[in-house]
Amino acid sequence: MSRYRHALPQLVDRLFLTDAGIGTTRRMIMATIPHAHITTAALAIALGGMTGAQTEQTWTDQFGVEPGELASTGRNPYFVLEPGYRLTLEDGDERLAVTVLADTKVVDGVETRVVEERESEGGELVEVSRNYFAISKRTNSVFYFGEDVDIYKNGKVVNHEGSWLAGVNGARFGLIMPGLPLLGGRYYQEIAPGIAMDRAQIVSTNGTLKVPAGSFTTVLRIEETTPLERGAREYKLYAPGVGLLQEESLRLVQHGTVR
């Protein structure tokens, strides 16, 4: 899901009102844990979706999840995991369509939901990824189990850069969206050493934003970085009941269920 593999983040000079003041917007995302380690942990994920101490230098990479509590279908306030739900974001001739498919895939012993992302520029396909998610029936936290990626050039697949799966080559699942996002929460979204190590920090929980699809309040703003690319920094913005509003310069133009 991360677009870091294509280019360095571009600063998007769009003012965004947050509960911390006025900021600028940009983008990024993801994380992982072996099935053998999907056991009980100390603190409930509902309280920020994390366990373990949080300091300025640490990012949570262990999550208190029981295997039986994970499902392939559900609805987090900021992340809809229901078949047929689609988000379409655009910026000029750039387009991103995110669709929750009817398909599921077992990854690291867990049945996950397949979410397809199709990125295009000028009508030409740039990337198609099949992302694998599961949601906790207990906390509504959504976990990320990996992705299969096809990178296109001139209509042909040229590589699969960025692909990873939890349980393969030391990769572990990560947290894509806490059931109850708390200001300042820091966690890994992807844990695939050397391939994908995206991490997130919640920097605002009460923003407002206007996009082509409408005006939204209680907007969640997440800053994403990766230790694999020092200095890279992007932002994603989410609205309750809808999901992703903005990613870099891409802004939501349409959302809803498709048949």
Regions found by a protein language model. Give the residues of each.
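Intrinsically disordered, low-complexity cationic segments
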Residues: 5, 33-36, 254
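Conserved functional acidic sites
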Residues: 54-259
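Bacterial N-terminal signal peptides
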Residues: 39-48
